[in-house]
Amino acid sequence: MTESIPKKPLKKGSLVFIDKSIYDGSVEALASDQDLPSYIFEGPGEILSIKEEYAQVRWRRPVPDVWFKLDQIKEYIVSE
């Protein structure tokens, strides 16, 4: 059933979270701190900018914005 729902492209302003299974196997994970905060995997973060295959994400916390590859980012769906 979910296969029939078209996937919306991520864009500026989209609410997102990081897919832990994809991130853990990436080159970026190997080059970064192994103890990442859980909020990046729970979301939501907001996409501020997209450049080629990377997106700059801002979290609703007093922390710096972070760049992630688009394939590591999933849309955050707000449950009503």
UniProtKB/Swiss-Prot annotation:
Which keywords has UniProt assigned to this entry?
A: Membrane, NAD, NADP, Plastoquinone, Quinone, Thylakoid, Translocase, Transport
Disulfide pairs here are none
Record's subcellular location: Cellular thylakoid membrane
Its UniProt entry gives the catalysed reaction(s) as:
a plastoquinone + NADH + (n+1) H(+)(in) = a plastoquinol + NAD(+) + n H(+)(out); a plastoquinone + NADPH + (n+1) H(+)(in) = a plastoquinol + NADP(+) + n H(+)(out)
Q: Which domain of life is it from?
A: Bacteria
Any one GO molecular-function label of the UniProt entry: quinone binding
Note the Pfam families from the entry: NdhO
User: What Gene Ontology cellular component terms go with this record?
Assistant: plasma membrane-derived thylakoid membrane
Identify the EC number(s): 7.1.1.-
What does the record say about its membrane topology? Peripheral membrane protein
Give the family this protein belongs to, as stated in its UniProt record: Belongs to the complex I NdhO subunit family.
Q: What is this protein called?
A: NAD(P)H-quinone oxidoreductase subunit O
